């Protein structure tokens, strides 16, 4: 009887060790798969198209017919392997408005490509290099409806901004990163002769580019996994770029701050609020007082776009 008992105990021990070994191997395999899933390329993006129309016929209260369309494409392709991280993004935006008998006029125009390559230095910090290129895709005009004239104020590659920065990238989580670059080169290009001859966007009259050397900071925060029931379909992204020219007026910091809030109604319908604030002391705009342009100076520029329409994530 005792021999049978010890035999049963021995068999159970062997069986238990076999099961434990299988579970351990399964856990190792699962951990390996999870680790591999965070490595390599990750790609995606969102496309949004917003439309607005007003049509009036014999409307006693008055008003004008109008039609507006605004499109946005934001894509990314990110790579991670070991201690190496490579982040790439492309943001495009374009909008048109037709009101009354006036022709179509541009309301938005954006081309923004960014690439950042980093290698882990220590926990949450990466040695990094960043390249950024910004321009627009179509001419921009200042309209005088009374005189029925328009003046060219911007165009493709007028301006265009090239920025190359070397520094340290702080990334404590998937939601936030701050890139600090004490070594940064920035080139502003104005390829249109009419605009460059006028000294637009900070270039000297007659010259087509402006080179600057300074310090750069880029911080970005994005979140789409809010726990609140009210915010569960909301995506929030805000990013700010700061540049200081070491050589000339370093206290005059160039600011570019963008925020996007997207409310997902269902798979294909969403509402978006997009804002952008710019300050650059080299960009001169009309100073308007009492409805009249009285001077030319450096002012804070602000743009806000609110749209409801079709959206598709991929």
What are these regions (language model features)?
Residues 43-47, 86-90, 127-131, 162, ...:
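Transmembrane beta-strands of outer-membrane beta-barrel proteins
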Residues 17-46:
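Sec-dependent signal peptide cleavage junction
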Residues 49-55, 81-83, 92-98, 133-139, ...:
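Transmembrane beta-strands of outer-membrane beta-barrel pores
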Residues 45, 49-51, 71-79, 113-119, ...:
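Residues on the lipid-exposed face of transmembrane beta-strands in outer-membrane beta-barrel proteins
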Residues 32-41, 78-86, 120-128, 175-178, ...:
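Short loop/turn motifs that connect adjacent beta-strands in outer-membrane beta-barrel proteins
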Residues 106-214, 295:
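Outer-membrane pore/translocation modules
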Residues 58-63, 97-103, 148-154, 201-207, ...:
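Extracellular loop and loop/strand-boundary signature of outer-membrane beta-barrel proteins
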Residues 300-314:
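Outer-membrane beta-barrel "beta-signal"
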């Amino acid at each position: 009887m005792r021999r049978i008992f010890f035999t049963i105990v021995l068999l159970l021990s062997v069986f238990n060790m076999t099961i434990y070994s299988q579970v351990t191997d399964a856990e190792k395999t699962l951990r390996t798969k999870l680790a591999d899933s965070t490595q390599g390329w990750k790609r995606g993006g969102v496309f949004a198209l917003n439309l607005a129309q007003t049509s009036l016929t014999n409307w006693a209260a008055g008003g004008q017919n109008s039609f507006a369309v605004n499109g946005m494409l934001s894509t990314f392709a990110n790579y991670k392997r070991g201690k190496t991280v490579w982040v790439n993004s492309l943001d495009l935006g374009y909008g048109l408005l037709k009101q009354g008998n006036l022709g179509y006029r541009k309301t938005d125009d954006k081309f923004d490509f960014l690439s950042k390559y980093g290698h882990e230095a220590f926990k949450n910090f990466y040695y990094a290099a960043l390249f950024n290129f910004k321009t627009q895709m179509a001419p921009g005009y200042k309209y005088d409806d009374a005189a029925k004239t328009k003046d060219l104020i911007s165009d493709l590659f007028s301006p265009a901004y090239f920025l190359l920065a070397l520094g340290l990238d702080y990334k404590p989580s998937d939601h936030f990163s701050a890139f600090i670059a004490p070594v940064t080169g920035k080139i502003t290009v104005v390829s249109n002769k009419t605009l460059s001859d006028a000294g637009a966007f900070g270039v000297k009259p007659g010259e087509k580019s402006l080179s600057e050397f300074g310090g750069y900071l880029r911080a970005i925060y994005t979140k789409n996994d809010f726990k609140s029931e009210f915010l569960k379909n909301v995506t929030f992204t805000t990013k700010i770029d700061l540049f200081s020219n070491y050589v000339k007026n370093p206290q005059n910091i160039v600011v570019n701050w963008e925020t996007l809030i997207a409310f997902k109604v269902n798979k294909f319908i969403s509402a978006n609020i997009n804002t952008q604030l710019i300050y650059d002391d080299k960009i001169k705009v009309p100073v308007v007082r009492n409805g009249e342009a009285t001077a030319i100076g450096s002012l804070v520029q602000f743009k806000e776009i609110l749209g409801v329409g079709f959206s598709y994530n991929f």
